C-alpha cells in the first residue's frame, strides 16, 4: 500500500478552500446574460467554447491532491444539480463557494463546525419553503417560451422551438436534441411511438417514391423469438387475410424461409404485410415489446408466458390506426390500447426512474416513458461551424431542462432576485450563537448569485443589490442585459423554482461537509526511479580485428 499524506484542521481547510476557489472562479464567469465564455482545450480537434457551468466544472482537475479534493466536491454540486434540475449548475457553484468561504472563516474564529452546519440546514429549509410558497405556476405556451429563452442566454428562437415542441408532445413527451447537417435549426415532431428499427426487406415498401411502408388500420403481431419458418403462424396469417387488414410482425428477427415466404405473398398481392426487428436488446427488448403491446392492446407472444405461436388468435394481436416504416424507423400512431393500462405502465416506469442509480438506465427509461406518454419531438441544431453547433446544442439542452423544471414546480423572478428576497425573510433562530452564525452564513451567501450576475455585466454589485432590497415588492429586480430596473417577471426574467431550490440544497449539503472536515488524506506523489545510465561509448583505438 502506498504511503499517504495526512493534513489536519486549518491547513487541510486552506488547501481545500483553494481548490474550491479555483473551480468556482472558472465556473462563475459564465453566470448571467452577460456571462463570459470559457475556452476548453481538447486533446484532438478544435478547442471547445462554452457558457455551460457543468461543462467547465467537469474539465477541471488540479495537480495538488488536497486542492483537487476541494474542487471535486464542488464539481459534485454542479453535477448533482444538473442531474436533478438540468440547469442552475453555475448558481449552485457560486452558492457553494460563498457558504464554504464564510464557513471556513467562522471555524477559524473558533466556532463549532457541527453547530454551524445545523444553522445552515435550518436556514436552507426556511428558504426552500419560502421559494415554493412564492412560485408562480406556468400555464401558457408564451410562458414556456420565456423560460426557454432565458436559459438559452436570451436567444428567442430556441425558446419558441422548445415551447412548440412541448405543445405538440406534451410536458412528459420526449424532446431530443441532435446536430443537424444544415446551417438551420429545425423542429420535427413524430406523433405516436417511434423506435429505431426499419423494414427487413425493401419489398415491403408500399410507397416506392418515398421508400416507406404505410399500413392503415393494421394488426400487430409481437413475438420475442426469431421466426425462421411460418408453419406455426399459418392459422393466424389466414385469419388476418380474411379480415382484409394489413399485418405488422415485430420479432427478434425474421429470416430465411419465413422472410422469403412473406415477401412472395406480399408481391403476389395476397397479403399486406411488413416485418421489423424488435427494438432494444436483452431485458430491455422484452420491456419495450411489452410497452408496444400495452400501447396497441395486444399480447407479447412469449414462451415464458406459455403462449405458443400455433395457438395465437386475432384478439391477441395489437391494433393501430397507422404504422409507418422507413429504412431506419418504425412509427406506430394511435394504438388501440386501453388508456388505464397505458397510465398504469407509465406509473410503473416512473417508479423505476426514481429507483435507478445508473444514468444510462435512467435515460433509457425516460425515452420509454415519453414514447408511451405521447410522441417524440426532435430539435436539430444547425450552425456554420462544428464549434458553433456544439455550443448551441449545450444551450438548448440547458434551456430544455430548465423549461421542464419550470413546468413541474413553477417559476420565481430570475437574476438571483428570488434568493436575494429570501435572504431578508429568514427569521429562524438557532439554539445557540454558533447556529445563529450558520443561519447568517446562508443569509450572506444568498446574495452571491445576484452579485455575480451584476459583476459579470460590468456593474457595481453592492449598489445594485442595495437598490433591489430598498423596494419591498418580490418581483422588482435588475435586468443585467439592458441595465434597467423593473418587474422581473414582466421583463421575462424568470427562474424555475426547481432549479433555484436544487442549487441551494446541493450547495449547502456539500459546503456543510467541507466546513465540518477536520482531516484530509491523499496518496504521496510517487518519486520516479532514477534513469538508467547511458551505454558506454566505444574505446578509442580499440578496433575489432
Swiss-Prot record:
Coiled coil: none annotated. GO terms for cellular component: cytoplasm. It is found in: Cytoplasm. It is an enzyme of class 5 (isomerase). ATP binds at residues 30-33, 51, 87-91, 415, 495. It catalyses: ATP + H2O + a folded polypeptide = ADP + phosphate + an unfolded polypeptide. CDD domains: GroEL (cd03344). It comes from the Bacteria. One of its GO terms (molecular function) is isomerase activity. Its EC number is 5.6.1.7. Forms a cylinder of 14 subunits composed of two heptameric rings stacked back-to-back. Interacts with the co-chaperonin GroES. Belongs to the chaperonin (HSP60) family. Together with its co-chaperonin GroES, plays an essential role in assisting protein folding. The GroEL-GroES system forms a nano-cage that allows encapsulation of the non-native substrate proteins and provides a physical environment optimized to promote and accelerate protein folding. This is Chaperonin GroEL 1. It comes from Sinorhizobium medicae (strain WSM419). The lineage of its organism: Bacteria, Pseudomonadati, Pseudomonadota, Alphaproteobacteria, Hyphomicrobiales.
Amino acid at each position: 500500500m502506498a504511503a499517504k499524506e495526512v493534513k489536519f484542521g486549518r491547513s487541510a481547510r486552506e488547501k481545500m478552500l483553494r481548490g474550491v476557489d479555483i473551480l468556482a472562479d472558472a465556473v462563475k464567469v459564465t453566470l448571467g446574460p452577460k456571462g463570459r465564455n470559457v475556452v476548453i482545450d481538447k486533446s484532438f480537434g478544435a478547442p471547445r467554447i462554452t457558457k455551460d457551468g457543468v461543462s467547465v466544472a467537469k474539465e477541471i482537475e488540479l495537480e495538488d491532491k488536497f486542492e483537487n479534493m476541494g474542487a471535486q466536491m464542488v464539481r459534485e454540486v454542479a453535477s448533482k444539480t444538473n442531474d436533478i434540475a438540468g440547469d442552475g449548475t453555475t448558481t449552485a457553484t457560486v452558492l457553494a463557494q460563498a457558504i464554504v468561504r464564510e464557513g471556513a472563516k467562522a471555524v477559524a474564529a473558533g466556532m463549532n463546525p457541527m453547530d454551524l452546519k445545523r444553522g445552515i440546514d435550518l436556514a436552507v429549509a426556511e428558504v426552500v419553503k419560502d421559494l415554493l410558497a412564492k412560485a408562480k405556476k406556468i400555464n401558457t405556451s408564451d410562458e414556456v417560451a420565456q423560460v426557454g429563452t432565458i436559459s438559452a442566454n436570451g436567444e428567442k428562437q430556441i425558446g419558441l422551438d422548445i415551447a412548440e415542441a412541448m405543445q405538440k408532445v406534451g410536458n412528459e413527451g420526449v424532446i431530443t436534441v441532435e446536430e443537424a447537417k444544415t446551417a438551420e435549426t429545425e423542429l420535427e415532431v413524430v406523433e405516436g411511438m417511434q423506435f429505431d428499427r426499419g423494414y427487413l426487406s425493401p419489398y415491403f415498401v408500399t410507397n416506392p417514391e418515398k421508400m416507406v411502408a404505410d399500413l392503415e388500420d393494421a394488426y400487430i403481431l409481437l413475438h420475442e423469438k426469431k421466426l425462421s419458418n411460418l408453419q406455426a403462424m399459418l392459422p393466424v396469417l389466414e385469419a388476418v387475410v380474411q379480415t382484409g387488414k394489413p399485418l405488422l410482425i415485430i420479432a427478434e428477427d425474421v429470416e430465411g424461409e419465413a422472410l422469403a415466404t412473406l415477401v412472395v405473398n406480399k408481391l403476389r398481392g395476397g397479403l399486406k404485410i411488413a416485418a421489423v426487428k424488435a427494438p432494444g436488446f436483452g431485458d430491455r427488448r422484452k420491456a419495450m415489446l411489452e410497452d408496444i403491446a400495452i400501447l396497441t392492446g395486444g399480447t407479447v407472444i412469449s414462451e415464458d408466458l406459455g403462449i405458443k405461436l400455433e395457438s395465437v388468435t386475432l384478439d391477441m394481436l395489437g391494433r393501430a390506426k397507422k404504422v409507418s416504416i422507413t429504412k431506419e424507423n418504425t412509427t406506430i400512431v394511435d394504438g388501440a390500447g386501453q388508456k388505464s393500462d397505458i397510465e398504469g405502465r407509465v406509473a410503473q416506469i416512473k417508479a423505476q426512474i426514481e429507483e435507478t442509480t445508473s444514468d444510462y438506465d435512467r435515460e433509457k427509461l425516460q425515452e420509454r416513458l415519453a414514447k408511451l406518454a405521447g410522441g417524440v419531438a426532435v430539435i436539430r441544431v444547425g450552425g456554420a461551424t462544428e464549434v458553433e453547433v456544439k455550443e448551441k446544442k449545450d444551450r438548448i439542452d440547458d434551456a430544455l431542462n430548465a423549461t421542464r423544471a419550470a413546468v413541474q414546480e413553477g417559476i420565481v423572478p430570475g437574476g438571483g432576485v428570488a434568493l436575494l428576497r429570501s435572504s431578508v425573510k429568514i427569521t429562524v433562530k438557532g439554539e445557540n450563537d454558533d447556529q445563529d452564525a450558520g443561519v447568517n452564513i446562508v443569509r450572506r451567501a444568498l446574495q452571491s448569485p445576484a452579485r455575480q450576475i451584476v459583476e459579470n455585466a460590468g456593474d457595481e454589485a453592492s449598489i445594485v443589490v442595495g437598490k433591489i432590497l430598498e423596494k419591498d415588492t418580490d418581483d422588482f429586480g435588475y435586468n443585467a442585459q439592458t441595465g434597467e430596473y423593473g418587474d422581473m417577471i414582466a421583463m421575462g426574467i424568470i427562474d424555475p423554482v426547481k432549479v433555484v431550490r436544487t442549487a441551494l440544497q446541493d450547495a449547502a449539503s456539500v459546503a456543510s461537509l467541507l466546513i465540518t472536515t477536520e482531516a484530509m488524506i491523499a496518496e504521496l506523489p510517487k518519486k520516479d526511479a532514477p534513469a538508467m545510465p547511458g551505454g558506454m561509448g566505444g574505446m578509442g583505438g580499440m578496433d575489432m580485428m
